[in-house]
């Protein structure tokens, strides 16, 4: 009977000795993000698309304790709404799907291979500073910082340069994670070259063509956010005047 349940639940989709398999990468990434202070409690999330499968970290599991058998698997493409129409082909018993799922799907529909959601304190702080200094409709921007080179200009446009100005849109938070989807998609449309969207008083969504690009872009952005907070303390402008 146990073998039948395992077969019906497609557990083979998350069983692999390959460390680069999404079901192994997601728990590893979540542990790293926990250790870096990007996610606490059970907040945040990570998802990877491989061919026509999407692997997603679950809701309610401590990030540093996550295992490969905790991972959900969806067919891709799949409807974002209603949740009951999503094509799950593997569901861990006694776990809930991530509330980030429709936001991850929005990134995958635009060609992403990996999407990361963190609750980085530096990301939250820059959203508050931008709101106070520039108003609720402003975006985060910074220029003339070397680490900007770690961010793409846009799909097929290469990487940003030292003299470029990086702009990241900011959307307002909502009471429920899934309700952010519309605002996230609107920001993606208004900023078609962006690979990230900040969520005020909440965190950030970052995506990339693959796992390495999403992770390194997330690292570069977090560095820039921390630097921006420290620059603000010293009265230094984020965008250098020409």
Swiss-Prot record:
Enzyme Commission code(s) on record? 4.2.1.109
Write down how the cofactor binds this protein.
Binds 1 zinc ion per subunit.
In alphabetical order, the GO MF annotations are: methylthioribulose 1-phosphate dehydratase activity; zinc ion binding
Keyword tags: Amino-acid biosynthesis, Cytoplasm, Lyase, Metal-binding, Methionine biosynthesis, Zinc
Please classify the protein's predominant subcellular localization into one broad category.
cytoplasm
Active site: which residues?
Answer: 146
State the source organism's domain of life.
Answer: Eukaryota
A single Gene Ontology CC term: cytoplasm
Protein location: Cytoplasm
Q: In which pathway does it act?
A: Amino-acid biosynthesis; L-methionine biosynthesis via salvage pathway; L-methionine from S-methyl-5-thio-alpha-D-ribose 1-phosphate: step 2/6
Keyword Zinc tagged = yes
Say what the protein does: Catalyzes the dehydration of methylthioribulose-1-phosphate (MTRu-1-P) into 2,3-diketo-5-methylthiopentyl-1-phosphate (DK-MTP-1-P).
What the entry lists under NCBIfam families is as follows: salvage_mtnB
Q: State the name under which the record lists this protein.
A: Methylthioribulose-1-phosphate dehydratase
Encoding gene, per UniProt annotation:
mde1
